[in-house]
């Protein structure tokens, strides 16, 4: 097995751009290969859904054609929003194995040609079918993870708001220093507090934007100044309700374990990191799952400023997905390129991290179900060199079996609310607001359902569940909701009779 190094890298500006997907991939690719002495012998493309976002298909061949390198093997890889990290991981394996010498990676997405509801609907296609048919979107599932995390670690509403606000303000500050970022302006506490709720408790400034952008990177077997020290990947259930824990990402923990093992490093060896902060709460959760902080204690370090650019462990000095932007297919590779910029001292003094020897990049595909962790290291770093991969025991993540479809039409049963959210920016075809919940039951274990009546719910509170017209609903067990439910059913029966 050979060591793998990073040669040239390039990235377009991220944002809502006039450029087409062809323009973006060509610009990033040409910039990357124009000054290299490496002969490219393979092309890997990362993109999540160019067919629907920008009406482009067969892009592995198209990009080879755009860059005038047709003739070499070209593949497109898709792992949802971690596609950029996926081509990096695969490229490392191909070079390490000796299959190729120099691989060009190009990752991109063009999303801004569609309205927000349409983009939300397309992104929701990575969600498990029953959850999606209930109206679930990525923000709503993220909100439920956040609520479960809040409950597990006994974080009150005010503290949770402070944690997420601090992360949002930090990442917007970092983005304001990044000339390639989608958002290049800072936000204030007032800006954050006054931003609209997307899916309770997530506000607009907790959510990453819809962005366009492209990235490119050359992996090589020839020694450069940055080597790949370790890489790990892990998957989890597509359905959120089937996971043993709703409050963290088991696949991040497993992917990180593999990357640390492969590199013979520990979390304490990492100098700075780019982590997947599609939602601000995820930055807090991810830094715990990656082993940087103890469970439930990341906020202590965040609020003390330890994750700022000048802190002891800078997190997302690029601005992260939150501020740099999130063109989904490009994001995973953008994180790696941002780390390379830092390691080569190619960023402004105000954005340069104090120690840039070893970096970790963490990318999430879907709602935490296809995750990559990559560790980069300066080749000059004085420690024993390690091979990219080592013998790792591949573990399976346990799950709770799906049981939503087992509920009979009009059957009623009781359970307790494990997590919930009220979604205000809904996917195309769903009315707003929409309350969604995950319910633990004795009979069917765990159910994903839609609230019949809007209102405030208590996590851990008793809930009644039933199926109607192939949709699973939940309601409170209170007398008021029972009366409303029977009144609704009687009115429906009367209307059905006259029809």
Model-identified regions with their sequence ranges:
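Conserved active-site "lid/cap" helical segment
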Residues: 1-82, 90, 149-160, 167, ...
């Amino acid at each position: 097995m050979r060591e793998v190094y990073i040669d040239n890298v390039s990235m377009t500006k991220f944002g809502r751009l006039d450029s087409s997907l062809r323009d973006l991939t060509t610009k990033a690719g040409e910039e990357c290969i124009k000054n290299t002495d490496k002969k490219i012998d393979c092309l890997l493309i990362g993109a999540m859904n160019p067919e629907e976002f920008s009406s482009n298909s067969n892009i592995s061949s198209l990009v080879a054609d755009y860059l005038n390198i047709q003739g070499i093997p070209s593949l497109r890889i898709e792992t949802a929003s971690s596609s950029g990290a996926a081509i990096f991981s695969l490229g490392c394996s191909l070079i390490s194995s000796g299959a190729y010498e120099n691989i060009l990676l190009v990752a991109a997405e063009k999303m801004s040609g569609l309205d927000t509801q349409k983009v939300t609907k397309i992104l929701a296609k990575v969600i498990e079918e029953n959850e999606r048919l209930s109206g679930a979107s990525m923000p709503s599932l993220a909100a439920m993870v956040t609520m479960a995390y809040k409950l597990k670690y006994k974080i009150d509403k005010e503290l949770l708001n402070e944690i997420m606000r601090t992360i949002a303000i930090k990442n917007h500050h970092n983005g304001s220093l990044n000339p390639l970022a989608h958002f290049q302006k800072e936000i204030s506490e007032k800006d954050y507090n006054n931003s609209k709720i997307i899916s309770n408790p997530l506000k607009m400034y907790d959510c990453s934007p819809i962005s366009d952008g492209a990235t490119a990177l050359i992996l090589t077997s020839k020694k450069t100044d940055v080597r790949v020290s370790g890489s790990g990947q892990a998957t989890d259930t597509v359905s959120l309700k089937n996971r043993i824990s709703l409050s963290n990402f088991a696949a991040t923990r497993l992917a990180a374990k593999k990357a640390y093992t492969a590199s013979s490093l520990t979390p304490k060896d990492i100098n700075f990191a780019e982590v997947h902060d599609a939602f601000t709460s995820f930055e807090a959760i991810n830094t715990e799952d990656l082993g940087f902080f103890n469970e439930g204690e990341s906020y202590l370090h965040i609020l003390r400023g330890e994750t700022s650019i000048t802190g002891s462990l800078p997190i997302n000095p690029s601005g992260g997905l939150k501020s740099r932007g999130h063109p989904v297919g490009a994001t995973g590779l953008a994180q790696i390129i941002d780390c390379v910029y830092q390691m080569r001292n190619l960023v402004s003094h105000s954005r340069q991290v104090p120690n840039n020897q070893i970096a970790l990049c963490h990318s999430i595909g879907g709602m935490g179900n296809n995750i990559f962790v990559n560790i980069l290291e300066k080749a000059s770093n004085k420690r024993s060199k390690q091979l990219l991969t080592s013998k790792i025991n591949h573990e399976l993540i346990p799950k709770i079996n799906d049981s939503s479809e087992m509920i009979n039409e009009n059957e009623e049963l009781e359970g307790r609310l494990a997590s919930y959210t009220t979604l205000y920016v809904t996917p195309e075809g769903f009315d707003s607001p929409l309350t969604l919940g995950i319910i633990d039951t004795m009979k069917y274990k765990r159910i994903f359902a839609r609230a019949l009546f809007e209102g405030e719910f208590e996590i851990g509170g008793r809930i009644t569940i039933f199926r109607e017209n192939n949709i699973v609903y939940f309601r409170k067990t209170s007398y008021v909701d029972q009366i409303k439910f029977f009144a609704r059913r009687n009115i429906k029966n009367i209307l059905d009779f006259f029809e």
